[in-house]
Amino acid sequence: MICTFLRAVQYTEKLHRSSAKRLLLPYIVLNKACLKTEPSLRCGLQYQKKTLRPRCILGVTQKTIWTQGPSPRKAKEDGSKQVSVHRSQRGGTAVPTSQKVKEAGRDFTYLIVVLFGISITGGLFYTIFKELFSSSSPSKIYGRALEKCRSHPEVIGVFGESVKGYGEVTRRGRRQHVRFTEYVKDGLKHTCVKFYIEGSEPGKQGTVYAQVKENPGSGEYDFRYIFVEIESYPRRTIIIEDNRSQDD
């Protein structure tokens, strides 16, 4: 009996061991398979990671590019806005006829004002040139007559060496320009001047009367006469030049 019991126990142990081996065998096989396939899986994962990383970076860069640049809808809207702005600007440049007429009238007015100013300036320059350089100007006649008075011996004997001339004297004592008179006789121009002289001799003063006549041959103006009236005592007249006899 004991022997049979021991044999039964041994048989059950064998059965238990065989069942355990059977249960462990698939696990071991799976483990080996996993160990065999792990490098390939790891390589596959690395390859996938390596291949996926650029895709992710490209995706990110694509996203950043699209976010930085305008969207197609916004580009269309901006283009339509620019076109509308250009059209409005072109439409705004069109000037109505009334505005053109106003601008033309204003330009014509400015032109008239400019021409008027030029004419006035030209007249002033002509007057100044005539007064300073023309032989028929009163200032020129006055200067020539004064030089003849300064060089005349009788005038020097009465008034002294330094003889000076001046025009009319106002109530305030200011000396004005030389008085003159112009007229035309027998088609020839005549100019008469009147001024005053005084010299180094105290209390001596004289009045000068001079007249010029246009010479038809040369166009110059020649003296007809130059007189000096001494106003102090004794009164007398100094004849510096008298050409009136040549008129006959």
UniProtKB/Swiss-Prot annotation:
Keywords: Membrane, Mitochondrion, Protein transport, Transit peptide, Translocation, Transmembrane, Transmembrane helix, Transport. The chain crosses the membrane at residues 108-128. GO terms for cellular component: mitochondrial inner membrane; mitochondrial intermembrane space; mitochondrion; TIM23 mitochondrial import inner membrane translocase complex. It is found in: Mitochondrion membrane. Residues 1-18 form a transit peptide. Component of the TIM23 complex. Component of the MITRAC (mitochondrial translation regulation assembly intermediate of cytochrome c oxidase complex) complex, the core components of this complex being COA3/MITRAC12 and COX14. Interacts with COA3 and MT-CO1/COX1. It is a single-pass membrane protein. Belongs to the TIM21 family. Pfam families: TIM21 (PF08294). Residues 67-98 are annotated as: Disordered. This is Mitochondrial import inner membrane translocase subunit Tim21. It comes from Homo sapiens. One of its GO terms (biological process) is mitochondrial cytochrome c oxidase assembly. It comes from the Eukaryota.
